[in-house]
Amino acid sequence: MGLFSGSRPDNLGFRDGKFAPPPWKPNCVSSTVVKDDKHYIPPLPYSGSAADAWKKLEALVAGLPRTHVVTQTGQYLYVEFKTATMGFVDDVEFALDEKTSAIQVRSASRLGVRDFNVNRERVERIRSAFAAA
């Protein structure tokens, strides 16, 4: 992959309604931590059909630049994003949560400590595009 790609994490997945807990580093956001946690970011709400919302998300994410879809099922999506400047790889997970009519999300940098809000801003851009689509 590249000098700044790092290794794929071994704790990926959505189990018991949660993603893996964020590391101590501030370079991760997750919708499945408690709301007062510094890593918290709200999930992506949807209305209407869960299947339609999921298809919309899959299409949106697949069209983003520097994106590699690794795992895609009917309720879980794992994507590697490569940053524009240095080519750092970030791991982003989405899970369809029909109980809450939301898509849960976790975005984390593989390397380094700080990400200068890259992961949070990416999720917010996806949220805006998802709401507008």
Feature map (PLM): residue ranges:
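Ser/Thr-rich, low-complexity intrinsically disordered terminal regions
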Residues: M1-A133
